[in-house]
Swiss-Prot record:
InterPro entries: Bact_Transpept/Beta-Lactamase, Beta-lactam/transpept-like, PBP_dimer, PBP_dimer_sf, PCN-bd_Tpept. This is Penicillin-binding protein PbpB. The gene is pbpB. Gene3D superfamilies: 3.30.450.330, DD-peptidase/beta-lactamase superfamily (3.40.710.10), Penicillin-binding protein 2a (Domain 2) (3.90.1310.10). Residues 1-35 are annotated as: Disordered.
Amino acid sequence: MSRRGDRPRTPAQPRKKARVDQPRSARTRRTRVSEAEAGLRSSSFVFRHRTGNLAILAVLVIAAVQLFMLQVPRAAGLRAEAASQLKVTDITPAIRGSIIDRNNDKLAFTIEARALTFQPTRVRKQLDEAWRKAQEAGSSTSDDVPNPDERLNEIAKEIAARLNNTPDAKTVLKKLKSNETFVYLARAVDPAIANAITDKFPEVGSERQDLRQYPGGSLAANIVGGIDWDGHGLLGLEDSLDAVLAGTDGSVTYDRGSDGVVIPGSYRNRHDAVDGSTVQLTIDDDIQYHVQQQVQMAKDASGAKNVSAVVLDAKTGEVLAMSNDNTFDPSQDIGRQADRQMGNPSVSSPFEPGSVNKIVTAAAAIENGLTNPDEVLQVPGSIHMGGVTVRDAWNHGVMPYTTTGVFGKSSNVGTLMLAQRVGPERFYEMLRKFGLGQRTNVGLPGESSGLLPPIDQWSGSSFSNLPIGQGLSMTLLQMAAMYQTVANDGVRVPPRIIKSTIAPDGTVTEEERPEGIRVISPETARTLRSMFRSVVQRDPMGVQQGTGPQAAVEGYQIAGKTGTAQQINPACGCYYDDVYWITFAGIAPADDPRYVIGIMMDAPQRAADGSPGSSAAPLFHEIASWLLQRHNVPLSPDPGPPLTLQAT
């Protein structure tokens, strides 16, 4: 039985320590601090987490935008850029057409040549790198790799030796050691020599650079012109006909891998080169050579500033020769020939012709029936006309000159007397018919039209100057064309110098022949040719002698006219008293015209042959006699009756 108060025993519980109660306020503060610290730690973690996420998101957005830009808007451009890094276009230069004379002799043609090239900075870097690696690898390897300096010296010596020391080794070496990215070591190199050099020295490059040849040197250079180093026309016909001569380059495009190997099947856009056409001229290189020689000799003998001469075919107006002194040589460096004549004065430099122009007055008077060759005019020593007094070149009283004699003796007064009969309007019309004040359109660059004042701009003195060849200007070609009209029975055929164009396939296209222009009747032309024989007529007594007997050619009838015109002094706008243009224009033979020759001398001190005076007639004689003999022109069957210049 149990006792009261007895209870079941439980395991013993550890005794709790006695708690010491603290004040309530202290406990509260401690609790709040702990909670605050926990809150701060939690907020910092959240901030860092969010910031990190935002940064990652921003990077992903930027990457996505860049990827989008690469794949969509810039994709085409990038593909094109990548393709261009692989794409290569090779150019095949067209061969420039030749320029030939009327007999197919070449005045200019092209031969294949090479230019030796080098990339100094790139090649030297490669040589230095190869040498360094060889040295590091050991002597056995370095024996197979050239020393960079020695290699460059070998290249320079090889090029100089094969090119006859032009350029020399020192010059080549200087280019090899330059800091340029690209240089030309030599130009105009024979392809075989260029190949030998590049085979031995792969560091040297070779590019095609065709060479223009001018076998005659300065022969006809004033007509043919020249080209620059890039093969483009620079002067003369080489320039004005550049599009015809140059042709069209060929090309082919292909892709090349990073290793430089052509990617198979990538060839495209293939265009074959079309070579330039050949241009045939009307000139005869033999005549051109002779005339050019004679012109230079006349310049040296006379002390003139310049001398020019033109030879035309009397019937067709074709230019057979056109020469001036001191002509440049297109086969040499044009840039070093500043003292040479680069232009073509025969078409580009007009001058006052002087008495050569009197043939217009004669033509107008004869054509209009206002005189005849044998009419005797009482010619005084001077004439007052248009407010000015004009005198003859020599003092004389009233002289009984025939119309023939007026022109044979070149009387200014007699010419103006006849011009008064013609009148200003008919005289001006005749000047225009003869082509003055108008370009001939011969086909040469830089042609001048000369100066012919319109009749409504004439001053009071114009009509006293123009009939005697002052107050207007013309080119030498225009002057010769006037006399071609008389030689061709009154029909002016505008001169031309381009005969035909020959395509690469051999197709010949003849240059269109200019249409003839009737200026005077055949009867007037024949009368003028007979009258103007008086100019070259000799007379031991001097009474019936003309002003240019030195122009005569034994056995042939020659018609022509001398000219002397005062030059203008730019300082005062007035005429010099002692500086002249000296001219001569003539027809050979006069009875059956074959050639028309025009000559201009600028301020000569002596005659063309060095004799006293200032006549161009001796130069005409030299050219005309050579032409007639060279082409076996038959002698004139009738030397013609003596002409009366002065009535007795």
